[in-house]
């Protein structure tokens, strides 16, 4: 066993020799420091405190590059144009808004040059005049500086995108804004809900946006009673069956007005282009406001007011049916 121990000891000596040679190559090293042995040399490098020899103080330099993830880089001294190693622990005054210690590429810094394991190292790194360094643009900011702007930003963007893409009118966009706020947290449900929400405005808006179309429906339904007037409006709100109701009333008027002349037809067309749109809009407005209270008496008033234009408007349609 003693012979084996003796054979193991000589290999242990050569690793110490390279460490000594590496230490001898450093400028400013002494033989007494190297003679402390391999383990002593490693332990002496760990403290990284006042044991390191200071070469220069308050030296200005430009950051050559700095890796934020690994936490080290190199600074090029302005006086000697020498690259000096810098570690993140050597940064004395960091940017208060940065989460990690770092220096930006191309930034001018002020530092002290000390003797390190493999050459010159930077210590007490600050900005020019002792101000905090700017830091790398790749270093993350602190939470309290980035939390609120990033949380408040997305709701506004989602509202604008939701209004521009899915709402055709400005009023509809204002109504869908609170809905977009509720939907931003669940993006996978955005495709399901907007069609349901968009049915409401399209069911209500056509009464405002397209009064003449419903005016024709109302004129056709004036002679039929209040019960038939309510049905077309309700079906238009939910399902677009407007063409069927346009065709229905003129067929019922054909036998009544076969004796009208062509001159009256032209006059009726001109009067329809001038006066009825206003009347139709007013009728729809009154009907919409007063419908839940007492629909039947208003229907009687509307039939009296609507009889003359109804005859004129149905005349060309009646003769077209006779010609067929």
UniProtKB/Swiss-Prot annotation:
The modification N6-acetyllysine is found at residues 301, 304. Changing residue 65 to F: Decreased binding to C5-methylcytosine (m5C)-containing mRNAs. Decreased ability to discriminate between m5C-containing and unmethylated mRNAs. The modification N-acetylserine is found at residue 2. Residues 61-125 form the CSD domain. GO terms for molecular function: C5-methylcytidine-containing RNA reader activity; chromatin binding; DNA binding; double-stranded DNA binding; GTPase binding; miRNA binding; mRNA binding; nucleic acid binding. SMART domains: CSP. Residues 1-49, 120-324 are annotated as: Disordered. InterPro entries: Cold_shock_domain, CSD, CSD_CS, CSP_DNA-bd, NA-bd_OB-fold. The record marks 219-220 as: Cleavage. Residues 155-166, 194-208 have a biased composition (Low complexity). Residues 15-71 are annotated as: Interaction with ss-DNA. CDD domains: CSP_CDS. In the CSD domain, Trp-65 specifically recognizes C5-methylcytosine (m5C) modification through its indole ring. The modification Phosphoserine is found at residues 102, 165, 167, 174, 176, 314. Residues 144-154, 241-250, 279-291 have a biased composition (Basic residues). Residues 30-41 have a biased composition (Gly residues). Keywords: Acetylation, Activator, Cytoplasm, DNA-binding, Isopeptide bond, Mitogen, mRNA processing, mRNA splicing, Nucleus, Phosphoprotein, Repressor, RNA-binding, Secreted, Transcription, Transcription regulation, Ubl conjugation. Homodimer in the presence of ATP. Component of the coding region determinant (CRD)-mediated complex, composed of DHX9, HNRNPU, IGF2BP1, SYNCRIP and YBX1. Identified in a IGF2BP1-dependent mRNP granule complex containing untranslated mRNAs. Component of the U11/U12 snRNPs that are part of the U12-type spliceosome. Identified in a histone pre-mRNA complex, at least composed of ERI1, LSM11, SLBP, SNRPB, SYNCRIP and YBX1. Interacts with IGF2BP1 and RBBP6. Component of cytoplasmic messenger ribonucleoprotein particles (mRNPs). GO terms for cellular component: CRD-mediated mRNA stability complex; cytoplasm; cytoplasmic stress granule; cytosol; endoplasmic reticulum; extracellular exosome; extracellular region; histone pre-mRNA 3'end processing complex. This is Y-box-binding protein 1. Residues 65-70 are annotated as: C5-methylcytosine binding. It comes from Homo sapiens (Human). The modification Phosphotyrosine is found at residue 162. Belongs to the YBX1 family. Changing residue 304 to A: Abrogates unconventional secretion.
């Amino acid at each position: 066993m003693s012979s084996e121990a003796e054979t193991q000891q000589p290999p242990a000596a050569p690793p110490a020799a390279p460490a000594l040679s590496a230490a001898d190559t450093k400028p400013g090293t002494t033989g007494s420091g190297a003679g402390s042995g391999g383990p002593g040399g490693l332990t002496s490098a760990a403290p990284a405190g006042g044991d390191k020899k200071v070469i220069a103080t308050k030296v200005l330099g430009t950051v050559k590059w700095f890796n934020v993830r690994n936490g080290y880089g190199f600074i090029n001294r302005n006086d000697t144009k020498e690259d000096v190693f810098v570690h993140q622990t050597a940064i004395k005054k960091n940017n208060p808004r940065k989460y990690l210690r770092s220096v930006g590429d191309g930034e001018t810094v002020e530092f002290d040059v000390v003797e390190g394991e493999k050459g010159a190292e930077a210590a007490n790194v600050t900005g020019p005049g002792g101000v905090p360094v700017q830091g790398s643009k790749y270093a993350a900011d602190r939470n309290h500086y980035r939390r609120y702007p990033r949380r408040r930003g997305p709701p506004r963007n989602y509202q604008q995108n939701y209004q521009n893409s899915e709402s055709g009118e400005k009023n509809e966009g204002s109504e869908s804004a609170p809905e977009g706020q509720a939907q931003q947290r669940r993006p996978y449900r955005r495709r399901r809900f907007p069609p349901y929400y968009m049915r409401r405005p399209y069911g209500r808006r056509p009464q405002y946006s397209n009064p003449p179309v419903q005016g024709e429906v109302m004129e056709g339904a004036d002679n039929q009673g209040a019960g038939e007037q309510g049905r077309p409006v309700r079906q238009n709100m939910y399902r677009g069956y407007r063409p069927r109701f346009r065709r229905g009333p003129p067929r019922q008027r054909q036998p009544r007005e076969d004796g009208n002349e062509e001159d009256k037809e032209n006059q009726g067309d001109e009067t329809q282009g001038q006066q009825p749109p206003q009347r139709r809009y007013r009728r729809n407005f009154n009907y919409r406001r007063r419908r839940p209270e007492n629909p039947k008496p208003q229907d009687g008033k509307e039939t009296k007011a609507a009889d003359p234009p109804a005859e004129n408007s149905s005349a060309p349609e009646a003769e077209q049916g006779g010609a067929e």
